[in-house]
Swiss-Prot record:
It holds the Pfam family DUF493. SUPFAM superfamilies: YbeD/HP0495-like. This is UPF0250 protein PFLU_5418. Transmembrane segments: none annotated. PANTHER family: UPF0250 PROTEIN YBED. It comes from the Bacteria. The lineage of its organism: Bacteria, Pseudomonadati, Pseudomonadota, Gammaproteobacteria, Pseudomonadales. InterPro entries: UPF0250_YbeD-like (IPR007454), YbeD-like_sf (IPR027471). GO terms for cellular component: cytosol. Belongs to the UPF0250 family.
Length: 91
């Protein structure tokens, strides 16, 4: 790698307050399913779960904070959420 190449930032695990934002279609029970999926992989700070609807009501954003232990954990959360079919993005 040359000096001009940019290195990807590395996360030092564990991260006690790691934010995750999930953008999905709006629907009954979807927030509960999203939280259930994330809870299979991580501890959620229930005090820091926020839900917002888009201006049209078509999409919902759920922001939550977890204890992140490693990159595999984050990958598994992302993969399982995306496999639902109603989650569009996990940031």
């Amino acid at each position: 790698m040359t000096d001009k190449e940019v290195k990807a930032p590395k996360i030092e695990f564990p991260v006690v307050d790691y934010p995750i934002k999930v953008i999905s279609d709006t629907g009954v029970g979807r927030k509960d399913l999203i939280l259930e999926i994330v809870r299979k992989h991580a501890t959620i700070n229930d005090q820091r779960v926020d839900e917002r609807s888009s201006s049209t009501g078509k999409y919902t954003t759920i922001q939550l904070h977890i204890v992140a232990t490693d990159q595999d954990q984050l990958y598994n959360i992302n993969s399982e959420l995306r496999a639902t079919g109603f989650v569009h993005m996990v940031l």
